[in-house]
Amino acid sequence: MLKTEPNDSFLNYALALEFAKANDVHKAIELIENVLLREVNYLGAYYQLGKFYEQIQDLPKAIDTYTKGIAIAKSIKNNKALGELNEALWMLED
């Protein structure tokens, strides 16, 4: 499906999760960063990208990612995503 729809955000997000399962977190990060370049409001990607940054111990990038996601969630009034991102950030800063 990616061959016919290479810019499909959902497909790229799902592929990133598969790379992460295969322990290729750096490839997963690359794919999700590309998703966010194309679709800035893809809120689930901020949470997952932050978690991937935590996995590789890049805490400043994790914090930045969660913070960006929080701003987007507020702007589009997505309280569920806002709560998840706030909690992830809080757990990191605790």
Which ranges hold each PLM region?
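Canonical positions in the second alpha-helix
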Residues: 1, 34-35, 69
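TPR alpha-solenoid repeat register
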Residues: 11, 45, 78-79, 85
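Structural marker of alpha-solenoid helical repeat scaffolds
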Residues: 4, 38, 72-76
